[in-house]
Amino acid sequence: MAVPDVQLSRRHQNILERFLSACQADERVVASFLIGSNAKGKADEHSDLDLYLVTTDAAFDDFVATRESFARLLGEPLFMEDFGHPNILFLIFADGSEVEIYYTSESQSGGFFNAPYKVLMDKKHSSEKIALSESDVDQAQQTEKLRRLIHWFWHNLSHFITALERDQLWWARGQLEELRAGCVGLARLSNNFSDTEVEEEVYFKIEDAMPVDSLAPLRETFCPMEREAMLEAASVILNSYKELARPLAQAHEIAYPEKLEQIMVERLEKISEDR
């Protein structure tokens, strides 16, 4: 079986053939698709294989209950997790292939297709009704993410200062990483306010999401786990934060925490003077 207009590696081709065979033989499955970078024509040798299937509404709960058995029809995975996501399995096979299987029911499938896809199997010709549309990002949710990034920064800075006051360098280093990640999240929102990867996986495919040259000042903050070096890094991160957070807060009508900034900057300056 070959997918039109798509070049796959041999190992991905083998998995795709097993996936299609499993879908064809399973009466619960009515359609299956190739999605992700392979469907977009942007895959490279390091890309994973993103697959998507649709079940009947009546069979969906049964499929969810037996999804691991279905996944094993593709091969014996060494890793199989959902990370708490209700409609996806993450798989790693012995040959190193990484596969993601998304699944949904017929009545819920319409909202998924906000990116290119390739039809693998369609028992009911339902794909003819699919209209490719851009995904709508909830701007209110994005504004709330921004508010959290702006305010949580000071909470993390407080922990960083407390850790150094107690000479707990491991804790301080961890908080420094949180501070930097917060700045990266702000930079992503500054570049594209509809960017959803600004909190939990802020570094995820960041080179594809924004010009990373704008993050150059933060490079020097990857420093040794030493008090002096971390204080200097915190100062750089703080400056980057203020350059990003203030205009974003103004643009999206979020009250900037002026008094909180004053208090925390004074604490940071004091501990810097005491070094």
Predicted segments with their positions:
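Metal-dependent nucleotidyltransferase catalytic core
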Residues: 2-27, 38-40, 46, 53-102, ...
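Hydrophobic C-terminal alpha-helix "anchor/cap" residues
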Residues: 23-24, 32, 179
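Conserved nucleotidyltransferase catalytic core and NTase-mimicking acidic/glycine-rich helix/loop elements
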Residues: 137-275
